[in-house]
Regions:
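Metal-dependent nuclease catalytic cores that hydrolyze phosphodiester bonds in DNA/RNA
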Residues: 1-107, 207, 216-220
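Alpha-helical structural motif
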Residues: 9, 16, 20, 124, ...
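Cysteine-cluster motifs in flexible loop/terminal segments that predominantly coordinate metals
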Residues: 19, 181-220
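Short, charged low-complexity intrinsically disordered segments located at boundaries
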Residues: 44-47, 53-58, 155-163, 195-207
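Nucleic-acid nuclease catalytic cores
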Residues: 77, 83-180, 192, 196-198
């Protein structure tokens, strides 16, 4: 169990799964830069991040910007939305002070793009589900994404594999945070979409040393 002082931002687990160096630059050195993708994501979340907004649509209720945390993972953050689905079975349900009955909580994340080929988004969603499980002593079987580009909802099963990835990522994040060491860059196709590319300088790794990088890129 991690203490309150040791908690890390849950949203960082997506950055970490995408690239450990990107996560460390953001969370250890407070580096940030914008690109088209980050700006589009912010615009989408302007319509989501209202903690006082509650929506009842049919049988289910949507809560916005819900605070969540896990001492076991050492992560805290805010879920874009939690959908409360009515249930006649009290198993794995929660109660809400304003809405009588038993409710199955489903974490929902809003993303501006479309489903990715890797599981970086799913890992973040699984971490949110695991926070809810710890907070309410329940089992959360699935979560969902709403992707702005395709205007479509995608449900995701919170599998044992995703849970293992979350635990391993959280453990590694805490180890790096304690060491204060920035991981080396690992250049790949993912670098092209990273807003920190000009700060990270992944090309340096291809040069072997700083002198070679300066000769090939700055002093030529």
């Amino acid at each position: 169990m991690y203490s309150e002082d040791d908690m890390l931002m849950l949203s960082g687990i997506q950055h970490y799964r995408f690239c450990p160096r990107q996560w460390a630059l953001i969370h250890l050195e407070q580096q940030w830069d914008e690109n088209r993708l980050t700006i589009e994501g912010q615009l989408l979340h302007k319509h989501v991040d209202d903690p006082f907004y509650r929506q009842k649509c049919g049988d289910y209720i949507t809560l916005r910007s819900v605070n969540i945390a896990s001492r076991e993972l050492g992560l805290y953050g805010i879920s874009d939305a939690i959908e409360l689905m009515p249930s006649d079975d009290i198993t794995d349900t929660i109660r809400h002070p304003k809405y009588p009955g038993h409710w199955l909580p489903v974490p929902v994340e809003y993303k501006h793009g479309k489903p990715k080929k890797n599981e970086v988004d799913e890992v973040q969603l699984a971490a949110q589900a695991m926070c809810l499980e710890e907070m309410y002593s329940i089992h959360v079987a699935y979560g969902a994404f709403f992707y702005g580009e395709i205007r479509h909802r995608v449900e995701v099963e919170i599998t044992p594999r995703l849970r293992d990835i979350v635990r391993e990522c959280a453990k590694e994040m805490h180890a790096i945070y304690q060491s204060r060491q920035i991981p080396m860059a690992s250049k790949g196709k993912h670098c092209d979409k990273c807003s920190l590319k000009n700060i990270c300088l992944p090309e340096i790794n291809d040069c072997g040393d700083v002198a070679t990088y300066l000769k090939n890129n700055l002093l030529a």
